[in-house]
């Protein structure tokens, strides 16, 4: 099939961009390296839009949470990623989490069935010299293409590190020591009856021993060329967090507040005391057979992981479907090398989208892919792109990536209200809701005036 646009990379951003283009009548060639005999060291399958790190799209609260607002805005623009996420949704309290396999399969099925999309399993080693192109190769860009990008952008480095959390088989968890509950008993329509997290409590003595085990455990060594590569805080390995101080984890992923331990009750606390520390597991698939260890991204060696994690109450006989790991991410200094439409300065036929632009997170990656698809469709139609207002989550994210961030200190960024034009006149308690109310109103006006789709 001849094509109007070539998309390189079939992750979240590339898949979303392909969908947005195809539903506007644009012919798309979607090149994905996996399935051609090539594989990254972090992916497990050759499925489109595979989720490598967590299975969570984070908060789905569109009234007081920035990523929840981004969910809302993407749904308003018929996002394939959000549509597939709803098909694959699993219970996760007030968050949105998905069954990885169901999600990837839904995205792939939808794209392969679309007459305007041709999915081609091939590795692309260099940036095309001509033709409208969207590069959405993500954090695991092949070395040859990364070198081509470095040459085209004049950058010295494109990389930082992410860590992956372990996944445990549900039937290997000893529920006589754990209980199911969401923090503060928060629920959503997708929630399980009792709650959405398995909680493994720790006493002070157990926590201190576990903390020391994280410090002492044997860790993956970096190769020489990797040693100066920084971490992104959003996927900070738990042992790195532990090294920051003995209390750091107790105020982070292992905090016990809002969780009532039914095995530690008293007259004063009939529902149970809050544990000194806790390890939480979140459902990872629709069947409920796999649960991931929340916040437990790690670069401990496999043997050290098994030994240490089996000291956690309830996980003494844990069987791991996947152990934690470390992978290298790739991103551009986008404020320096991209224009306001995500085009590479000096080679404007090429757009970048997704995590390679320096946005961080599944939803953010897909959102940038969505906008790249819309921009490219507008360009093909000979129309002028008027981007979403900066007061929206989409507009705030795009503005940050394409020029509002400081180029000298640019780092991967999740969507957050700090990227929005401030509302200083609104009291702090009402400010988050004011941001989302303003965004929804402005998005509605933008869609009415700018978004014309013949799907």
Swiss-Prot record:
Catalytic activity annotation: uridine(54) in tRNA + (6R)-5,10-methylene-5,6,7,8-tetrahydrofolate + NADH + H(+) = 5-methyluridine(54) in tRNA + (6S)-5,6,7,8-tetrahydrofolate + NAD(+); uridine(54) in tRNA + (6R)-5,10-methylene-5,6,7,8-tetrahydrofolate + NADPH + H(+) = 5-methyluridine(54) in tRNA + (6S)-5,6,7,8-tetrahydrofolate + NADP(+)
Alphabetical list of Gene3D superfamilies matching this protein: FAD/NAD(P)-binding domain
Binding site for FAD: 9-14
EC numbers: 2.1.1.74
Family annotation (InterPro entries): FAD/NAD-bd_sf, MnmG-rel, MnmG-rel_CS, MnmG_N, TrmFO
Keywords (A to Z) from UniProt: Cytoplasm, FAD, Flavoprotein, Methyltransferase, NAD, NADP, Transferase, tRNA processing
The keyword ATP-binding is assigned to this record: no
Cofactor: FAD
GO biological process, alphabetically ordered: tRNA methylation; tRNA wobble uridine modification
GO cellular component, one term: cytosol
Subcellular location: Cytoplasm
Major site of localization recorded for this protein: cytoplasm
Any one GO molecular-function label of the UniProt entry: tRNA (uracil(54)-C5)-methyltransferase activity, 5,10-methylenetetrahydrofolate-dependent
The protein's role, per its UniProt record: Catalyzes the folate-dependent formation of 5-methyl-uridine at position 54 (M-5-U54) in all tRNAs.
Family membership: Belongs to the MnmG family. TrmFO subfamily.
NCBIfam families in the cross-refs: gid_trmFO, PRK05335.1
Name this protein carries in UniProt: Methylenetetrahydrofolate--tRNA-(uracil-5-)-methyltransferase TrmFO
Native species: Erythrobacter litoralis (strain HTCC2594)
């Amino acid at each position: 099939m001849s094509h109007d646009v070539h998309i390189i990379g079939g992750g979240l951003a590339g898949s979303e961009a392909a969908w947005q283009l195809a539903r506007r009548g644009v012919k798309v060639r979607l090149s994905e390296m996996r399935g051609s005999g090539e594989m990254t060291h972090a992916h497990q399958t050759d499925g489109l839009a595979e989720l490598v790190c967590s299975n969570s799209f984070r908060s789905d609260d569109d009234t007081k949470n920035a990523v929840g607002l981004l969910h809302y805005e993407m749904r308003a623009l018929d996002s394939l990623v959000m549509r597939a996420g709803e098909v694959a949704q699993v219970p996760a309290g007030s968050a949105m989490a998905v069954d990885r396999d169901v999600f990837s399969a839904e995205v792939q099925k939808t794209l392969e069935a679309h007459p305007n999309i041709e999915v081609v399993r091939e590795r692309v080693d260099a940036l095309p010299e001509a033709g409208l192109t969207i590069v959405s190769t993500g954090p695991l860009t092949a070395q040859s293409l990364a070198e081509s990008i470095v040459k085209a952008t004049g950058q010295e480095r494109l990389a930082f590190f992410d860590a992956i959390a372990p996944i445990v088989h549900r039937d290997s968890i000893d529920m006589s020591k754990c209980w199911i509950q969401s923090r503060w008993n928060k629920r959503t329509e997708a929630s399980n009856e009792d709650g959405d997290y398995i909680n493994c409590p720790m006493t002070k003595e157990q926590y201190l021993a576990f903390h020391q085990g994280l410090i002492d455990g044997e860790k993956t060594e970096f190769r020489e060329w990797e040693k100066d590569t920084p971490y992104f805080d959003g996927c900070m390995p738990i042992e790195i967090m532990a090294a920051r101080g003995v209390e750091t984890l107790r105020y982070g992923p292992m905090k016990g507040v809002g969780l009532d331990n039914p095995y530690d009750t008293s007259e004063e606390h009939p529902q149970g005391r809050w544990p000194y520390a806790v390890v939480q597991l979140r459902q990872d698939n629709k069947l409920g057979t796999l649960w991931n260890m929340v916040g437990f991204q790690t670069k401990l060696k496999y043997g050290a992981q098994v030994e240490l994690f089996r000291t956690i109450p309830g996980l003494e006989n844990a069987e791991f479907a996947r152990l934690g790991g470390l992978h290298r991410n790739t991103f551009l200094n986008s404020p320096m090398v991209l224009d306001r439409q995500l085009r590479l300065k000096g080679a404007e036929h090429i757009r970048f989208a997704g995590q390679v632009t320096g946005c961080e997170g599944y939803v953010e990656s897909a959102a940038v892919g969505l906008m790249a698809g819309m921009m490219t469709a507008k360009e093909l139609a000979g129309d002028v792109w008027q981007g979403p207002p900066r007061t929206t989550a989409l507009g705030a994210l795009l503005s940050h990536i394409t020029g509002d961030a400081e180029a000298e200190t640019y780092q991967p960024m999740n969507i957050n209200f700090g990227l929005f034009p401030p509302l200083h006149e609104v009291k702090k308690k009402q400010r988050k809701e004011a941001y989302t109310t303003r965004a929804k109103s402005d998005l509605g006006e933008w869609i009415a005036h700018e978004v014309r789709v013949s799907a």
